[in-house]
UniProtKB/Swiss-Prot annotation:
This is Protein Nef. It comes from Human immunodeficiency virus type 1 group M subtype B (isolate PCV12) (HIV-1). The modification Phosphoserine is found at residue 6. InterPro entries: HIV-1_Nef_anchor_sf, HIV-1_Nef_core_sf, HIV_Nef. A motif (PxxP) lies at residues 72-75. Its main location: host cell. Residues 108-124 are annotated as: Mediates dimerization, Nef-PTE1 interaction. The record marks 20 as: Might play a role in AP-1 recruitment to the Nef-MHC-I complex. The N-terminal domain is composed of the N-myristoyl glycine and of a cluster of positively charged amino acids. It is required for inner plasma membrane targeting of Nef and virion incorporation, and thereby for infectivity. This domain is also involved in binding to TP53. The SH3-binding domain constituted of PxxP motifs mediates binding to several Src family proteins thereby regulating their tyrosine kinase activity. The same motifs also mediates the association with MAPK3, PI3-kinase and TCR-zeta. Monomer; cytosolic form. Homodimer; membrane bound form. Interacts with Nef associated p21-activated kinase (PAK2); this interaction activates PAK2. Associates with the Nef-MHC-I-AP1 complex; this complex is required for MHC-I internalization. Interacts (via C-terminus) with host PI3-kinase. Interacts with host PACS1; this interaction seems to be weak. Interacts with host PACS2. Interacts with host LCK and MAPK3; these interactions inhibit the kinase activity of the latter. Interacts with host ATP6V1H; this interaction may play a role in CD4 endocytosis. It is a lipid-anchor. A motif (Diacidic) lies at residues 174-175.
Length: 206
């Protein structure tokens, strides 16, 4: 009884079973494609480039040169709470994101790098709408977007070498509220899901 499954196939099963047991749930606030990954272990036909903005964006990036390969080096997976917290602290320790002026292009590069090196599908870095502070929808991500004070903007724009295409010189053109935003680390976001309190409507399907 059991046929061909009885001996040879059972060899790797304990490791697979353990991996399944340890698989963490997707963090609150990730997108539909990540929910697919959580439930099915793959992105299904319900999330394609035709009907999912994150899938369409990713497909477009694969045809563009961004300085590193876009295809993940590791298995594709949804962002988890623990991974978001760990990534936040890693970036804080390494520096470079804190106080950096936000632009969609910079966010895209960060998302692609994380997708390529860690395999996290890039539909997790979303924020509450403005005006004012934008809080991360993904619970565990400890970076919020904070409007830059006018004095700081003036100071940054004083330098003669400031490129007209630098995010600080675009005066919030990327932002629906026309605010210039910067990434700001806030460790409390690991314990307090502000976005869920402010916008419970975004989490109805979580």
């Amino acid at each position: 009884m059991g046929g061909k499954w009885s001996k040879s196939s059972v060899v790797g099963w304990p490791a697979v079973r353990e991996r399944m047991r340890r698989a963490e749930p997707a963090a609150d606030g990730v997108g539909a494609a990540s929910r697919d990954l959580e439930k099915h272990g793959a992105i299904t036909s319900s999330n394609t480039a035709a009907n999912n903005a994150a899938c369409a964006w990713l497909e477009a990036q694969e045809e563009e040169k961004v300085g590193f390969p876009v295809t993940p080096q590791v298995p594709l997976r949804p962002m988890t709470y623990k991974a978001a917290v760990d990534l936040s602290h890693f970036l804080k320790e390494k520096g470079g994101l804190e106080g950096l002026i936000h632009s969609q292009r910079r966010q895209d590069i960060l998302d692609l790098w994380i997708y390529h090196t860690q395999g996290y599908f890039p539909d997790w870095q979303n924020y509450t709408p403005g005006p004012g502070i934008r809080y991360p929808l993904t619970f565990g991500w400890c970076y919020k977007l904070v409007p830059v004070e006018p004095e700081k903007l003036e100071e940054a724009n004083k330098g003669e070498n400031t490129s007209l295409l630098h995010p600080v010189s675009l005066h919030g053109m990327d932002d629906p509220e026309r605010e210039v935003l910067e990434w700001r680390f806030d460790s409390r976001l690991a314990f307090h899901h502000v976005a869920r309190e402010l916008h419970p409507e975004y989490f109805k399907n979580c």
